[in-house]
Structure formats: C-alpha cells, structure tokens
C-alpha cells in the first residue's frame, strides 16, 4: 500500500494568524485569555491552547468585565462588538481577513438599503457573524443553502439585490446556487470574484486530483469544520470512499481491506502534526510508500495585530 499526500493541505493563512493571536496574547498578557467560540474548528488546536491558559466561551456574558477576549477566525456580528465595547472588554480580533472582506460587502449593502442574499450553512458561526453585519430595517439579509431555498425567497426581480457567500463552501454547490440566483434575479449583483477563499479552493482542487488516484481518501479535520466536511464530500462525489477523522486514533484497520492507494489531506484548521501521525499509523498497518502531489504553492500571510507582535531580541 502507498499513501499520496494532497498539496496544499492543512493550515491556511487565516488559521495561522488566529492561532498566533491567541498564543501571542497568552505570552504577552498571561492567562486567562478568553476566546469567544473555538478560535478555529479543530479539537487538537483548541485543547492545546486551553492547556496554555485560553478559556473558550460561546457568549460574552461568560467573560468578566474588563477582561481580554479574542474573537474567533469565523468573525462576529456588530451586536457582539458593541456588547464587548459596552462591557469594556479588551478585544483582539482574529477574524480571518477574507471573512472581514465579506463583512464589508454586507455592511455596504446595509448602508445602501440593498437586500442581501448570503449563500451559506445555517448555524455556522461565520454565517451568524456575516448576517450580523446587516442592520438596515429597510432592506434585509436572507440566507440560502441550496438551489431549492431560492424558490422560498419572497423577493421581487425589481428589488435591488446583491449576493455574497460563506468562505468555506463547496465550489461546485455554490456555483449552482449562484447560477440559479442569476436566473431568477437577472439584475442581481455580486462580488467580482467568488468569496470562497483561496485555501478552500486550493484544497478542493487538490482533493479532486487526489481522488482520481486513490481507493480511499482520509480527511484530517474536526466534524464541525465546514471546509473539512466539504473535502470529504467532494471525494465521495467522485466515487471514492472518504473518511473524516480527528486524528490517527479514529482509523479503522478494516478501511484498508482491498485498498492499494490511500489519499490523505487535511482541512484548513488541521495541523500537519496530525497528518504525520496518521501517516505513521498507516505505516504500522502496512503502508510502505509515501508520495506527495506537486500541487500549488501558497505564500499568503496575514499579520497579527501590531500590539501582539513579539520581537525577538538577540
């Protein structure tokens, strides 16, 4: 048996930045540091930060007045920002800059009174934060997850409409929804470039290539990670058995029966150490070769806030 590693895989620039913000805040300010929601959707990462003194909460009422709080990479609503200000909380914002870009699109629509349609998954924290950027009662923001949802929209063709998307969606599914929106509302406006982020796009393209060469695709990522789920779904759609796992402990040896090539990738919030532990476990189960796809190079870097930049002194 052999392993083929997808490339690119694992951490993206937004996740790197979010984790660095929590780590730097702990180093500079000490614990406790409060984090609203899991800073990224990965159990291994969150547990590691928790051990270092980060306290993860779901709502700001769990944070003492005047404390330091970090907003997760998924972003928050304007109401949450205002609550933090009212509570005199010291905020470090780990929202991914690519999510912030979508927030700005929604805020612009809100100011103009343009009705906005967000393509995304209901209940996902990124969606909640993005919809929370719209505060104009004369307009409105509406969530659709599928082509079927479009028929339920009570909007008119003559309405001033715009759309935007969650950053971690399936490229194929989103393209279908956008096309259906344009058919129903020919005058609808949208971003010049798809809001799905570069990392999501690159990892889905890598899985396409991986699935063509594999009998089994293993995606390393947490169950609540949107982009990890999309990777597993994509491999399945291509006719390959796919498994989404947190770590090597989730591997079932029976998966390897009649398998000669195992493809491995990782969601944007899964660290490389987990991938390597999966490789090691599979080698114990009989894998003899490890190869890696050439893929594309990613060199995007997002800076942490200035006051959290740690300068090494020689």
UniProtKB/Swiss-Prot annotation:
It comes from the Bacteria. GO terms for biological process: dimethylallyl diphosphate biosynthetic process; isopentenyl diphosphate biosynthetic process, methylerythritol 4-phosphate pathway; terpenoid biosynthetic process. Its cofactor is [4Fe-4S] cluster. Isopentenyl diphosphate binds at residues 41, 74, 124, 225-227, 269. It catalyses: isopentenyl diphosphate + 2 oxidized [2Fe-2S]-[ferredoxin] + H2O = (2E)-4-hydroxy-3-methylbut-2-enyl diphosphate + 2 reduced [2Fe-2S]-[ferredoxin] + 2 H(+); dimethylallyl diphosphate + 2 oxidized [2Fe-2S]-[ferredoxin] + H2O = (2E)-4-hydroxy-3-methylbut-2-enyl diphosphate + 2 reduced [2Fe-2S]-[ferredoxin] + 2 H(+). It is an enzyme of class 1 (oxidoreductase). Its EC number is 1.17.7.4. Dimethylallyl diphosphate binds at residues 41, 74, 124, 225-227, 269. Pathway: Isoprenoid biosynthesis; dimethylallyl diphosphate biosynthesis; dimethylallyl diphosphate from (2E)-4-hydroxy-3-methylbutenyl diphosphate: step 1/1; Isoprenoid biosynthesis; isopentenyl diphosphate biosynthesis via DXP pathway; isopentenyl diphosphate from 1-deoxy-D-xylulose 5-phosphate: step 6/6. Binds 1 [4Fe-4S] cluster per subunit. The active site is at residue 126. (2E)-4-hydroxy-3-methylbut-2-enyl diphosphate binds at residues 41, 74, 124, 167, 225-227, 269. The keyword Iron-sulfur applies. One of its GO terms (molecular function) is 4-hydroxy-3-methylbut-2-enyl diphosphate reductase activity. [4Fe-4S] cluster binds at residues 12, 96, 197. Coiled coil: none annotated. HAMAP family: IspH. Belongs to the IspH family. This is 4-hydroxy-3-methylbut-2-enyl diphosphate reductase. It comes from Pasteurella multocida (strain Pm70). The gene is ispH.
